[in-house]
A protein has these predicted regions:
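Radical SAM [4Fe-4S] cluster-binding motif and immediate context
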Residues: 154-319, 324-326, 330-339, 367
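Structural recognition of alpha->loop->beta junctions
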Residues: 109-128, 268-276, 338-351
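Flexible glycine/acidic-rich beta-alpha junction loops that bind and position SAM and/or redox cofactors
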Residues: 11-17, 106-108, 179, 228-229, ...
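Acidic/polar loop patches that form or flank catalytic/metal-binding clefts of enzymes
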Residues: 139-142, 250, 319, 347-352, ...
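Radical SAM enzyme core and accessory elements
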Residues: 2-6, 48-51, 133, 379-520
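Conserved beta-strand positions
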Residues: 6, 72, 119, 219-221, ...
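Acidic, low-complexity intrinsically disordered segments
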Residues: 2-213
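Amphipathic alpha-helical segments that form well-ordered structural scaffolds
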Residues: 38-42, 310, 400
Length: 520
């Protein structure tokens, strides 16, 4: 029997980490990492597994030193902390195993700090490693010959995490994406053929999330709609489960913009209680989209703004991923992004400079052209050297755009254009259910008002900037004059907390004494 500790290192402050918003929500971290509870589920008895998420609790290195195996996972934004943890473990003589997105694309990054490295998916290689370890002959490197059969993936062991410390739950329906964006590592690691879990698997995981008292859940697929026919059948099962159980879960997900071209799919997503979707729009510059092979964003069916508006009209808020620094971008790109996001009524936009991830086609192309900065911490925040502007102009424009987008007036004007002027209806599924169950609807309204009041009170008392506190109060009052809806008010309160995080992040990016860190 092996005593195993699995660690998810602390993230550096990032856009999706919501570190500056979490205290107002009474939480330690935004989402639980998927790898840890899944690896625990893949570990057969009599092995014993302990999960440690450093984002919600400190690592007990004395405890780790007593373990037979300590596994560490992590993404690019966690790589520095991963290295620190591994160095401490090696100093204590611990056998270390490393996996996750970063080591999968940069296998030699940790050198001798890692006894065993897992490249890519590990549903088959983790159990194989444990058998090899028991026999005293673990390999240095493991990589699956074939992609994981998702119909055989077990439900993650959420019971081994302190789920109450997370703001949101997470669930994965599928892996893989059919498209071929040049900068994306997903198709490198997970392939272009979408692979889905069965409806029975997914419903089991949703039930586990409900049992852990999660209410808002991110469907963390990189493209939920990669196989539209299959996901429609899954969504119908999710809708039936929501109806049976009283719509206990609200979802946010990720999808490609061709979602806007499928009215049936949008309707099913809304009925399943998906209220927001993150879309990789990347750029309003069509030449940049062609350059990076983001061809799905150039298909017929209207402009990107028109497609975003169709998704919003269906009943889902759109969050955007935007990238600066493509070869076809000049210094006019910053204003083009600002105008696009305002016209599209997108308040939440993760904007970052183009970065070349190892093993991607972009990385190989830029390396061949001598346009990669190979330093661990590039001076201008990204390893990709732009073509039509200087690196200084790109980094200055990026920081300036972040400051502009998250200036309170600009952010809330975009938000109000959607929720007030646009009157988006993101609560359709629950409202229809509530008409059939009026007592549940009344209790929900009371709960939502109380949650909204609590969050807004914490924001307007604790935010150190007095002008910002006044702005939050003013905007909420204006919303309630127009739409006295507790669900919309709760979303608005959460979006206010998210704004505080993004604004604080933007201000720190602009601080002259801080190193420039690209948005993740």
């Amino acid at each position: 029997m092996a005593d195993i500790v699995l660690i998810n290192p602390k993230f550096e402050i990032s856009f999706w980490g919501l570190e500056h918003a979490l205290p107002f929500m009474g939480k330690r971290a935004s989402l639980p990492v998927a790898a840890l509870p899944l690896l625990a589920a893949l570990t057969p008895p009599p092995h014993r597994v302990t999960l440690v998420d450093e984002n919600v609790e400190a690592i007990d290195f004395e405890r780790c030193a007593r373990a037979d195996i300590v596994g560490v996972t992590g993404m690019v934004v966690q790589r520095r902390r991963m290295r620190e943890i591994l160095a401490e473990l090696k100093n204590r003589g611990v056998f270390t195993a490393v996996g996750g997105p970063w080591v999968s694309v940069k296998e030699d990054y940790f050198g001798a700090l890692a006894d065993t490295v897992f490249v890519g998916e590990a549903e088959e290689t983790w159990p194989r490693f444990l058998r090899d370890w028991q026999q005293g002959a673990p390999l240095r490197r493991y990589e699956q010959a074939e992609k994981t059969d998702m119909s055989r993936v077990p439900a993650p062991r959420l019971d081994l995490l302190s789920m109450r410390r997370y703001a949101f739950g997470s669930v994965q329906f599928s892996r893989g994406c059919p498209f071929q964006c040049e900068f994306c590592d997903i198709i490198v690691m997970l392939g272009r053929r979408p692979r889905l879990k069965s409806a029975a698997q997914i419903l089991r995981e949703l039930e586990n999330l409900r049992r852990e008292r999660m209410t808002t859940v991110f469907i963390v697929d990189d493209n939920l709609i990669g196989n539209k026919k299959a996901i429609k059948e899954i969504l119908r099962e999710v809708i039936a489960w929501q109806e049976r159980e009283g719509y206990p879960l609200l979802f946010v997900t990720e999808a490609s913009i061709d979602l806007a071209d499928d009215a049936e799919l949008m309707s099913l997503m809304v009925e399943a209680n998906i209220v927001a979707v993150f879309v990789g729009i990347e750029s309003p510059n069509e030449a940049s989209l062609r350059e990076t092979k983001k061809l799905q964003n150039l298909r017929e069916g209207g402009s990107a703004v028109e497609k975003v508006h169709r998704i919003q009209a269906a009943g889902m808020e759109v969050w955007a991923g935007m990238i600066l620094g493509f070869d076809n971008d000049d210094t006019g790109v910053f204003e083009a992004h600002r105008r696009f996001l305002a016209e599209a009524r997108i308040s939440t936009a993760m904007v970052g400079m183009l970065s070349a991830i190892p093993k991607t086609p972009l990385y190989e192309r830029l390396a061949a052209a001598g346009r990669l900065d190979l330093e661990e911490d590039p001076a201008h925040g990204t390893n990709a050297i732009p073509l039509q502007m200087s690196r200084e102009a790109l980094s200055r424009g990026y920081v300036g755009l972040m400051e502009t987008l998250y200036a309170p007036a600009a952010y809330f004007d975009r938000l109000d254009d959607l929720y007030l002027a646009g009157a988006i209806d993101v609560d359709r599924a629950w409202r229809q259910y509530g008409r059939r169950h009026p007592w549940r609807a009344r209790l929900r309204r009371l709960r939502l008002w109380l949650e909204t009041a609590g969050l807004m009170t914490r924001l307007t008392l604790s935010v150190p900037d007095a002008a910002l506190r006044r702005e939050y109060r003013r905007r909420m009052r204006a919303l309630l004059r127009e739409r006295r809806d507790p669900f919309i008010a709760r979303i608005y309160a959460i979006k206010s907390a998210m704004h505080y995080h993004a604004l604080t992040l933007a201000r720190r990016l602009a601080a002259p004494d801080r190193p420039l860190i690209n948005t993740y």
